[in-house]
Amino acid sequence: MTDAVQNETVQEASAQEENKLIAERRAKLDQIRKSCKANGHPNDFRRDSLAGDLQKEFGEKSKEELEALNHVVAIAGRVMAKRGPFLVIQETSGRIQAYADKDVQKVLKDKYQGLDIGDIIGVKGALHKSGKGDLYVNMEEYELLTKALRPLPEKFHGLTDQEMRYRQRYVDLIVNEDSRNAFVVRSKVMSAIRNFMISKQFMEVETPMMHVIPGGASARPFITHHNALDMPMYLRIAPELYLKRLVVGGFDRVFEINRNFRNEGLSPRHNPEFTMMEFYMAYADYKDLMDLTEELLSSVALEVLGSTSMPYGEHTVEFGGTYTRMSMFEAIKHYNPDHAQIQALTEEDIQNRDLMVSIAKSVHVEVEPFWTCGQLLEEIFGETAEPKLMQPTFITGYPADISPLARRSDDNPFFTDRFEFFIGGREVANGFSELNDAEDQDARFKAQVEAKESGDDEAMFYDADYITALEHGLPPTAGQGIGIDRLVMLLTNTHTIRDVILFPAMRPQA
């Protein structure tokens, strides 16, 4: 028998067993409905305690102290284990045991015996402590709140199918503590970032999710249709241009935490729908942003994890202190010490397209015919340097032709006052001094339109209203976007973005 045939046989047997268990549970529910006025789904039980709170408040008390207290609680949750008279009940804050002595079991009779793993119950009783020191509720009252018709995957050796974890996240969260913890961390990260920004006098705002003209980033948009207006609209790829309109309007510090949508491929680092925190501050430049980012990330790590140092794969990442800063040009030379062409490269050579194409091909970059010198430089960097940036690093010196919204450098107008922030070998943030020269922005938008006509699907559209906003005057401003999903990946030592997005995009099942 081949492995494939054997696996298919095992799967068929598991499916048959599961179907049998489902049928048995449905029969139990039918019996419950006959004897329950709520049709088997009562909604009058009220809990007054959480397992986690009880552990904190009473976990250190002795068995004798708890007996003297006779503290009665009402708990509710999902049955995760049933061992004779003991039940393990799980809810959002943790787990606690419930104990049904023989007298209680006699009273409950079939009601207790018919209980299955996965059922949701309510229990009332006094808190006690076992000989091993574990808290438990001495069951005096018990009520089945929801009958689980499907068995949990422990019956079938756990939820080991990675794709099924994402498709049935609800099951993953029930049985996988690591998954639950990752999303608790995510929630804390969001709260910590929000609180930090508010403490720095930033105002939280909401900008449109559907745009008439997509903008703010180089990406392919999702297209939809507004029936009432009979016009195409685009799910936003970035909120940038709307946020800068607010700065023009007089809100000097704004931020938004929300979703962006990009009609691109799936990978361990990319999901078409993802979360960004984007912010803008007037009378600041990109160097101020780097300082603020150092403070923000060290603060978030300390608040969420209790430390600025954490493991990531085989490395230990340090969020505290001052982060490395180097230009893209410097990084390419630094991480390619044995590449003669790169070591001989000068900043002036970057504008020699033939030379840049030659170098790009030598490091296995598949060159597109419409790429500019700046795009070639970025691709060489991405291929040879980016994966090596494990510790927090700001990469500066981005060419203007790949930075259509960034202010040109006063020292060399070929470059811009822009950085991207890397950690764990991936980009996590992008920031720059904003281009507030309306005429320069107009010219760059037109160059983007030409690039799109030449085959660059990710080039930006021309946004006339944004030019009008700039003509009213945008103060000197700096802005930045931080990828929440990738940041959470780092803080949870996770290597695929699907593990930190509750419901990631999935291909249809066959």
From Swiss-Prot:
SUPFAM superfamilies: Class II aaRS and biotin synthetases, Nucleic acid-binding proteins. CDD domains: LysRS_core, LysRS_N. Its EC number is 6.1.1.6. It holds the Pfam family tRNA-synt_2. PROSITE patterns: AA_TRNA_LIGASE_II. It is an enzyme of class 6 (ligase). Binds 3 Mg(2+) ions per subunit. Mg(2+) 1 binds at E420, E427. GO terms for biological process: lysyl-tRNA aminoacylation. Coiled coil: none annotated. Belongs to the class-II aminoacyl-tRNA synthetase family. HAMAP family: Lys_tRNA_synth_class2. This is Lysine--tRNA ligase. It comes from Vibrio vulnificus (strain YJ016). The lineage of its organism: Bacteria, Pseudomonadati, Pseudomonadota, Gammaproteobacteria, Vibrionales.
